[in-house]
Amino acid sequence: MPHRKAQQHQGIGLGKISTKYSLLVLLATILLIIVATIGGKNLYFRGDYDIFFDGTNKQLLAFDEIQTTFAKTDNLAIVVAPEDGDIFTPQTLSLIQKITVDAWQVPYSSRVDSIANYQHTEAFDDDLLVEDLLYSEYELTPERISKVKSIALSEPVLKSALVSEKGDVTVVNITVQLPEMDKTAEVEEVVSSINAMIDRYQRAYPDVTFHKAGIIAMNHAFMTAAQDDSSTLVPTMLVVILVFLTIMLRSILSVIATLIVIIGSVMATMGISGWAGMFLSTATVNVPTLIMTLAVADCVHVIATMRQSMKNGFTKVQSIERSIALNFVPILITSVTTAIGFLMMNMSDSPVLRDFGNLSALGVMVACFLSVTLLPALLKLLPIHVKMEMSQDQKHFMDRLGDFVVSQRRALLPLSVAVIVVCASLIPLNKVNDESVEYFGQRNEFRQAADFMEERISGMTNISIAIKTNESQGIAAPDFLNTIGEFSSWLRDQPETDHVATLADVYKRLNKNMHGDDEAYYSLPQARELAAQYLLLYEMSLPYGLDLNNQINVDKSSIKMVLTVANLGSVELVDLENRIYQWFAEHAPQYQVVASSPSLMFAHIGETNMASMLSTLPITLVLISALLIFALRSVRLGLISLMPNIAPAVIGFGLWALISGEINLGLSVVVTLTLGIVVDDAVHFLSKYQRARREGQTAEQAVRYAFHTVGRALWITTVVLVAGFSVLAMSSFRLNADMGQLSAIVIFIALVVDFLFLPTLLMLFDKKAYLQERPSDNARLKASSTITATQS
């Protein structure tokens, strides 16, 4: 068996180096960690939504085109809600005027819209009067307030946009033009300024509730979600690790050695990412939590085997060397398979998910390296003593479980298959659904603002629709005006619609004004020259910062409409987008239409990401299966392991259909993410099973041997992994929370499958006797088998 001998010699050699030159190995690895960690100074944080999309993303390119053609729409909306439920009071209207004036002082502000400075138009003799709806020169008398209320609640531009239908909530919308030199810092600067303003007004108006909404608020929510995770989840994970390690290892010094390895793994990984020029995001900020979890599993195998060997009379040095010899290949194989799973995330359409996969894969391999170099050196130098025997109850439980599986294999196999089939049938009940607002938990300030706005005014989901005539001054053509008029009416008839901001309403109002405010003329002008003159007259009357550049391009060849809808899921939003394109294809194919928005971008990426992830699944399976076949030197065992490796994800997603039924961007990567991890259990179980078979044992005896030698270690590492991903499930950011929750479910199911389903397959399809090891090898294996009670 030259292959297996080579593997074991590598492990033995590595173990001897780490024990013979322990101080040198310790210093060398710590030096490497320090050099890597220095790269952390280059790390910076990005919290804007752009990081989720490639520069070549179709929807992002469309949105950038709209942003370039028209004024940018990055905004922060201050929602004002007086407790008395009426904004049309002198006190509240005065407050809105003050906020509107102060909002111009917000950093990077380029436009402020509110009912206070809404440019109301009306006929004045034979002229057009354009002035602020809450003109500062007018006293807020009951008559004036009544007129303002009547206009605000009837004007399509304002109703369900800047003021609620009931008149109990209003919005001051601040548009900002960020330089985008350091978008994260700029967003923080804007939000800090707004917070200071709100705090000031909150003290002066204690009976008024304020909320922050809009794109800038969403970007800030991404930032705070990541910061909250890093400040809460990582410390929580450390506590969880300390608790579980103390319970499992019953040795403070062993716990300290493990902590040094996992902290070193995290520091080195994040430092290397800094050297590579990467940045932190809401996705990658949780990489340390994953690395800690996976590194603990490696350390547990090494320490548990060493301690069991010491209990059987070997010296500490011998025990460390034996532990590395027995664990090196399983740890290497499981680390590589886990890394492959993470690396397959490079097929994701989202850059931050690719970064998450690459960093996690790097962290896994760093942890693998340190667990077979730094860890044994630490174990050699620390005065570790074994005092307690492993619980006999736990030993007996695994033996009894092995006996149960062997005796009940005829029932367990069809039962397992039935569970897999039933869960597979539930998978179609899952729907891909990304709703960016719901990425944040109910306690999140932005989520609360979004829910409040949807309940009282309108949803925060919008679609910018650019309509191009491809003709200078073409927007004044009667055919075009009639088209956008009909399209606007069609949009308002859609069940999802909350508000439509359209130039058609401006034209209708101007046409009425120019005919003495006669309601009979509230319609679109039908003469091109007249329409152009109306618009020119109106634009010349508008004050600085309140022009129509956010709706009309420079040469007046295209317009932008903004559709605001309820906070829809991705499926409904994409369906609405398709209906928009279909309307133009049927009614106005001569015009070019581009629709996009951040919400629409998130809606599309969830679907495309799931498709790309599913397309990588066969590649991942082939790579991992090939690795297993190579490691085990058995095509039969490699093929047998395929179903138990796929089953956990199948069962997990089937159960998810009952738990939630929604697949978001985070869950779209769970299959490839967990596949590499769930293979670990199969590798350890199969390696022990194969060892026994090569000693001449039957399949049934080998299954019992595998349970006896590796059962407890698999249980321990699964508990640690499930605990780690469960901590991730505590994230305030739903993408991370759902990913953690489903991953924890899949990993736990993997243990159940490897305990109940894999053994039954082995006993059914692996009955043929193995070529036995030569006597010398057999004796060596028997001698070493006594120390593998807890190793994996």
Q: Residue ranges of each PLM-predicted region?
A:
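Juxtamembrane segments of multi-pass membrane proteins
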Residues: 408-530
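Hydrophobic transmembrane alpha-helices and their membrane-interface caps
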Residues: 254-302, 637-687, 726, 753-756, ...
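Hydrophobic, glycine/alanine-rich multi-pass transmembrane helices and their short helix-loop junctions
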Residues: 244, 332-375, 379, 625-628, ...
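Extracytoplasmic
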Residues: 64, 139-252, 482-485, 536-624
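Interfacial segments of transmembrane alpha-helices in multi-pass membrane proteins
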Residues: 227-278, 347-351, 615-661, 730
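Helix-loop junctions and hydrophobic alpha-helical segments within the transmembrane domains
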Residues: 309-336, 693-716
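Membrane-proximal extracytoplasmic
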Residues: 2-238
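Signature of alpha-helical transmembrane segments and their immediate interfacial
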Residues: 2-47, 377, 385, 389-436, ...
